[in-house]
């Protein structure tokens, strides 16, 4: 079964992630991009089409989302039948997106540790401060210099 993907964040990393997902859309299902500015998501989608990044015809859609709004994120995940959420938005949204994934059963992939806006530059262990508290409840994958759970 193909897995529908929601990419949260439409900056530089979101652009790269969306193109990589498009290059593997034979294995993935629908690809959705969401950010506070859906026009940025649409620009990424347009660049995917312009470069011919899709392996085969597929669903690519842009959505407006305030990822700090757990209810809105949860609703979008359910509405689109999302299986995998790739969070490449601001580090301040990690816990809200993770909570929405826990509540919906979606797998959560991330590229950065969570930062609390009131506690920037916290002391290590950074992952243990936030995300690792939930590692037994869901699938959490960190992409980058460190990775936690290996369950997928």
Per-range role (PLM):
Residues 143-152:
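Residue-level detector of conserved catalytic or cofactor/ligand-binding positions
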Residues 65-81, 93:
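Conserved Rossmann-fold cofactor-binding substructure of NAD(P)-dependent oxidoreductases
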Residues 103, 112-144:
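Rossmann-fold NAD(P)-binding glycine/threonine-rich loop
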Residues 36-40:
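Helix N-cap at the beta1-alpha1 junction of Rossmann-like dinucleotide-binding domains, i.e.
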Residues 13-16:
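Hydrophobic/small residue at the entry helix of a nucleotide-binding pocket
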Residues 67, 84-95, 105:
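N-terminal glycine-rich "phosphate-gripper" loop used for MgATP/nucleotide binding
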């Amino acid at each position: 079964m193909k897995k529908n993907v929601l990419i949260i964040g439409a900056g530089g990393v979101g652009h790269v992630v969306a193109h990589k997902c498009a290059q593997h859309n034979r294995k993935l299902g629908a690809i959705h991009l969401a950010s506070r500015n859906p026009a940025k998501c649409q620009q990424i989608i347009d660049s995917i089409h312009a470069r011919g990044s899709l392996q085969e015809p597929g669903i690519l859609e842009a959505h407006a989302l305030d990822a700090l709004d757990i209810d809105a994120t949860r609703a979008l995940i359910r509405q689109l039948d999302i299986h995998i959420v790739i969070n490449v938005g601001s580090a301040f949204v990690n816990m809200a997106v993770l909570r929405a994934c826990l509540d919906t059963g979606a797998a959560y992939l991330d590229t950065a540790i969570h930062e609390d806006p009131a506690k920037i530059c916290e002391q290590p262990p950074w992952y243990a401060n936030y995300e690792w508290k939930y590692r037994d409840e869901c699938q959490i994958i960190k992409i980058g210099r460190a990775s936690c759970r290996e369950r997928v």
